[in-house]
Regions:
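Cleft-lining beta-strand/loop regions that shape enzyme active-site pockets
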Residues: 22, 36-37, 53-62, 200-207, ...
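Cleavable N-terminal signal peptides
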Residues: 9-11, 20-21
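PDZ/PDZ-like domain segments forming the peptide/carboxylate-binding groove
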Residues: 76-77, 98, 112, 117-128, ...
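Bacterial N-terminal signal peptides that target proteins for export
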Residues: 1-8
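Boundary at the C-terminal end of the N-terminal hydrophobic targeting segment
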Residues: 20-22, 29, 189, 205
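N-terminal-proximal low-complexity accessory segments that begin disordered
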Residues: 37-79, 89
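Acidic/histidine-rich, surface-exposed loop or edge segments in extracytoplasmic proteins
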Residues: 24-34, 45-57, 95-99, 193-197, ...
């Protein structure tokens, strides 16, 4: 069960989301959802665990020692830089690390969900603190250092240590923008927008995110090339393998709260319309006979799911053209089957001295 996937949102499309329509800021911890396991996850956990333990080429025992390794990997996936959780948080859950094998077999993933929810709460607190640091005068006169890779560093012992880490992080972010030629006002505006967006993303997480992370930690502990694919990622994987999909032929990306056209597939509906340009923002999506849905602040994968559809069907996009002071317009596109030619193997012949050399360019592996 050796799997892989690349996260590129292909909306028949292909995908990447920010301007400034009204999107509610998250200012309280109780606005962050407390995520719980959904019914189907118990069944999937039992089946995945059974498949891994019985059929994986690498034989292993899902015992207490292996359970502890899964816990450590999950913990580091949650807080890779060790700058969100406290040492006491880690110690609290470490007492249950040997129980994860039993949870995976039974499908009752309480430790995974409880730890994820705590990390969400702590992350909210950190970005709120970072916003408060931005209100202070910038000072680059000290001889400070900032450790970019804290993956091997111990977790902070208390809030004071955690605050010190984030003081350094904010200063590093400020200095990076300063060196890029930004004014103090522009720096504060940019970082305020960045940190608030990170907080809003916390409110967009769902139960599948937790489950996928738990299964990924389990799979990668067995073998670094083994992965769990959620239903959405399975669809993405199949698209990558077939080099085709049905949609509008646009590569999208997230920019703050907005879904932005990053590029377009030549000959696809978006490019042929000549009504959409790179840099335009998609602020609304409407299906035939249904009202336009405001997608500002949505997760990218949710916007992609709304835009994709069967060949021959129509989708309406409310487009905010790139640039300041522009008004939105509605563009109707007919979805088509898109061939991802740029990802196919290409052959060329190059002359080297008196010899000719054949060169194969293989962007990725696929079927067909």
């Amino acid at each position: 069960m050796n799997m892989f996937f690349r996260l590129t949102a292909l909306a028949g499309l292909l995908a990447i989301a920010g301007q400034t329509f009204a999107v509610e800021d998250i200012t309280r911890a109780d606005q962050i959802p407390v995520l719980k396991e959904e019914t189907q996850h118990a069944t999937v956990s039992e089946r995945v665990t059974s498949r891994f333990t019985r059929s994986h080429y690498r034989q292993f025992d899902l015992d207490q020692a292996f359970s502890a390794k899964i816990f450590d990997r999950y913990l580091n996936l949650l807080d890779y830089s060790h700058n969100v959780l406290l040492a006491s948080d880690v110690e609290q859950f470490a007492k249950k690390k040997t129980e994860l094998g039993d949870e995976l077999r039974s499908g009752k993933l309480d430790v995974f969900y409880d730890l994820y929810n705590l990390a969400q709460k702590r992350r909210f607190e950190r970005y709120q603190y970072a916003l408060s640091v931005l209100e202070k005068p910038m000072d680059f006169t000290g001889n400070d250092t900032y450790n970019l890779d804290r993956s091997k560093a111990p977790w902070p012992k208390n809030e004071a240590e955690l605050n010190a880490l984030w003081d350094s992080k904010v200063k590093f972010d400020e200095l990076s923008l300063k060196l890029a030629g930004k004014t103090d006002k522009e720096i504060r505006e940019t970082l305020t927008r960045r940190y608030k967006f990170a907080i809003r993303r916390l409110a967009q997480t769902n139960s599948e995110d937790v489950f996928s992370l738990a299964m990924t930690a389990f799979a990668r502990e067995i073998d670094p090339h083994t992965n769990y694919l959620s239903p959405r990622n399975t669809e993405q994987f199949n698209t990558e393998m077939s080099l085709s999909l049905e949609g509008i032929g646009a590569v999208l990306q997230m920019d703050d709260d907005y879904t932005v056209i990053n590029s377009m597939v030549a000959g696809g509906p978006a490019a042929k319309s000549k009504a959409i340009s790179v840099g335009d923002k998609i602020v609304g999506v409407g299906q035939t006979g249904k009202p336009m849905v405001d997608v500002i602040g949505w997760r990218l994968d949710d916007v992609v799911a709304l835009i994709k559809g069967p060949k021959g069907s129509k989708v309406r996009l409310e487009i905010l053209p790139a640039g300041k002071g522009t008004k939105t317009r509605t563009v109707t596109l007919t979805r088509e089957r898109i061939r991802l030619e740029d990802r196919a193997v290409k052959m060329s012949v190059k002359t080297v001295g008196k010899e000719k050399v054949g060169v194969l360019d293989i962007p990725g592996f696929y079927v067909g």
